[in-house]
Structure formats: structure tokens, C-alpha cells
Amino acid sequence: MATKETGGQKHATRRNQEVEEIEVTTETSVRNEKLAEDVDDILDEIDEVLESNAEDFVRQFVQKGGE
């Protein structure tokens, strides 16, 4: 019977699948960490812009509201 798998073949296949899953998980984790760092950098830039422009925004709002 040529189609019958032996226990060793199944075990090797499972082990290969586990190794592939671990590699994919590691790659995904590294990619997620990089994306998280990029998002943090962008949020920091947004905070800086908001802080520098907030004073001007408030002045304009007060002037318009006071007119």
C-alpha cells in the first residue's frame, strides 16, 4: 500500500509545520514591534504639532468668539 503514511512521516510533517508556525509568529512579532514604533513616532509628531499650534488656535478661537 503506497498511500499509507508511516508514523515517522506524520511526525516529521507535524514538526515541519510547527517550525514554520514558529518562524511566521516570530516574523509577525518583529513586524508588529516595528509598526508599533512607527505609530508611536507619528503620534509624537502629532503631539508636537498640536502643542506648538494650540496657542494660536486658542487665540483665534477667543478672538472670533469675542467679536
Swiss-Prot record:
Positions of region (Disordered): 1-26
GO function terms (MF aspect): proteasome binding; protein tag activity
Region named ARC ATPase binding: 23-61
InterPro entries found in the cross-reference section: Ubiquitin-like_Pup
Protein task: Protein modifier that is covalently attached to lysine residues of substrate proteins, thereby targeting them for proteasomal degradation. The tagging system is termed pupylation.
Family (UniProt): Belongs to the prokaryotic ubiquitin-like protein family.
Comment block on domains: The N-terminal unstructured half of Pup provides a signal required to initiate unfolding and degradation by the proteasome but is not needed for pupylation, while the C-terminal helical half of Pup interacts with ARC to target proteins to the proteasome.
Subunit and interaction comment: Strongly interacts with the proteasome-associated ATPase ARC through a hydrophobic interface; the interacting region of Pup lies in its C-terminal half. There is one Pup binding site per ARC hexamer ring.
Protein name: Prokaryotic ubiquitin-like protein Pup
Species, as recorded: Thermobifida fusca (strain YX)
Gene: pup
